[in-house]
């Protein structure tokens, strides 16, 4: 399975994550700051793994 890592959990990052998931990619989104609550809910609903407050090197490389 192809893997897509997205840095940044704003509108375009979350949109890209959803599109990648729909296209069959394994998606991981990482944001150094904090995600807006409705973006967290959307990512959880779509089954997309994510983190906030850090960029964990082992997860993004």
Label the predicted regions.
Residues 1-61:
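N-terminal leader/targeting and accessory segments in enzymes
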């Amino acid at each position: 399975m192809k893997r897509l890592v997205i840095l940044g959990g704003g509108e375009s990052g979350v949109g890209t994550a959803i599109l990648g998931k729909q296209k069959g990619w394994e998606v991981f989104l990482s944001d150094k700051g904090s995600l807006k609550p409705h973006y967290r809910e959307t990512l959880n609903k779509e089954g997309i793994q994510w983190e906030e407050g850090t960029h964990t090197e082992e997860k993004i490389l």
